[in-house]
Amino acid sequence: MATNLRKTHPMMKIINNLVIDLPSPSNISAWWNFGSLLATCLALQIITGIFLAMHYSPDISMAFSSIAHITRDVQYGWLIRNMHANGASLFFMCIYLHIGRGIYYGSYLYKETWNTGIILLLLVMATAFVGYVLPWGQMSFWGATVITNLLSAIPYIGNTLVQWIWGGFSVDNATLTRFFTFHFLLPFAITGLTAVHLLFLHETGSNNPTGLNSNTDKIPFHPYFSYKDLLGLILMLTFLLTLTLFSPYLLGDPDNFTPANPLSTPPHIKPEWYFLFAYAILRSIPNKLGGVLALLFSILILFLMPTLHTSKQRTASFRPLTQILFWSLVADLLVLTWIGGQPVEDPFIIIGQVASTFYFLILLLLMPAAGMIENKMLNLK
């Protein structure tokens, strides 16, 4: 009998166990598609990014012009650039939906997978931030100045640290060069950590919408979920191409069409839409250090999710109180995103403060309390 190369070859055996013969729960829904979509986003960003790096000049006198050159003169440069910029937005849409799925269905109880996932989120956020500085427009420059300047709130070493990151006394050529270096380097670190993330996931297997052990009811990944993922992939790429070809600058900031000018501050400094919720939390605290800590904790709070899980049931599928709180959290994050893009004036200040308080209240207090109440109601000791 001929041996199956797919199952015996050292290299193909790994791929086989990863995407072909992988035992998967039979009832996982479309919410489980986002892992493969994120991998696709990452591949797309690396490919388009490498082509952009071929034509980009990381120098303050040429950066803005080189972006204009890519858009105007390079073959399909406009497409590559717009796919890269909007691909980042799509990356964050997928990552937030992926995390939301994890919170709703209790996937965070796979602690190693969850923790590597949060580190991946932090790396993706860092990559997006340094990448936003590269076009050297007004919002790039002032965004970099404001966000890096937050580190000066750290007692004793703050100012030294900021100057060390800047490579001088202000955001300048040295800053742009190092940000380009990190923007090129980090996606490869993300790729490596993604492999670790998958390694930990495949130690336990996927969770499912019921939260019950699915070992008695597994099906092979291929053809069932490979085709299901392919459908999600086609829908995602259709959305990306529609956005890129019809409204490429919809999610960008008009200020970035103006070259960076250290002598002129834009009226409203704000980051890209995917950071607005964290920016709103930062601004809602009148104290600089307090704001920075709130900003940090708004992401790092995710590390506490397994500890804060009090329910005897894993998912929120059969827990109405937790469902109400989860969707309240989603609504709260949408409010924070809206507030982050508004000027610092009434009534936006108080709305931001209330929404920020609710964000931490839901995650730290109300969700654990709801879990305990539901246990009591169901007589689960």
Curated annotation (Swiss-Prot):
GO cellular component, as recorded = mitochondrial inner membrane; respiratory chain complex III
Residues where heme b b562 binds: H84, H183
Q: Which residues are a ubiquinone-binding?
A: H202
**What note does UniProt attach to the cofactor annotation?**
Binds 2 heme b groups non-covalently.
Q: Which domain of life is it from?
A: Eukaryota
Name any cofactors this protein relies on.
Answer: heme b
Subcellular location per the Swiss-Prot or TrEMBL entry: Mitochondrion inner membrane
Q: Which PROSITE patterns match?
A: CYTB_CTER, CYTB_NTER
Annotated Gene3D superfamilies: Cytochrome Bc1 Complex, Chain C
Main subcellular localization, coarse class? mitochondrion
Residues passing through the membrane, by range: 34-54, 78-99, 114-134, 179-199, 227-247, 289-309, 321-341, 348-368
Could you cite one Gene Ontology molecular function of this protein? metal ion binding
Spell out the disulfide connections: none
Membrane topology classification: Multi-pass membrane protein
Task: Report the record's Gene Ontology biological process terms.
Answer: mitochondrial electron transport, ubiquinol to cytochrome c
Q: Which residues bind heme b b566?
A: H98, H197
Q: Does the keyword Heme apply?
A: yes
Question: What InterPro entries does this protein map onto?
Answer: Cyt_b/b6_C, Cyt_b/b6_C_sf, Cyt_b/b6_N, Cytb/b6-like_sf, Cytochrome_b, Cytochrome_b_C_euk/bac, Cytochrome_b_N_euk/bac, Di-haem_cyt_TM
Keyword Metal-binding assigned: yes
Keywords, ordered alphabetically: Electron transport, Heme, Iron, Membrane, Metal-binding, Mitochondrion, Mitochondrion inner membrane, Respiratory chain, Transmembrane, Transmembrane helix, Transport, Ubiquinone
Q: What does this protein do?
A: Component of the ubiquinol-cytochrome c reductase complex (complex III or cytochrome b-c1 complex) that is part of the mitochondrial respiratory chain. The b-c1 complex mediates electron transfer from ubiquinol to cytochrome c. Contributes to the generation of a proton gradient across the mitochondrial membrane that is then used for ATP synthesis.
What assembly does the database describe for this protein? The cytochrome bc1 complex contains 3 respiratory subunits (MT-CYB, CYC1 and UQCRFS1), 2 core proteins (UQCRC1 and UQCRC2) and probably 6 low-molecular weight proteins.
UniProt miscellaneous comment: Heme 1 (or BL or b562) is low-potential and absorbs at about 562 nm, and heme 2 (or BH or b566) is high-potential and absorbs at about 566 nm.
Q: Which family does it belong to?
A: Belongs to the cytochrome b family.
**Per its record, how is this protein called by name?**
Cytochrome b
What organism is the protein native to?
Chelonia mydas
Q: Which gene encodes it?
A: MT-CYB
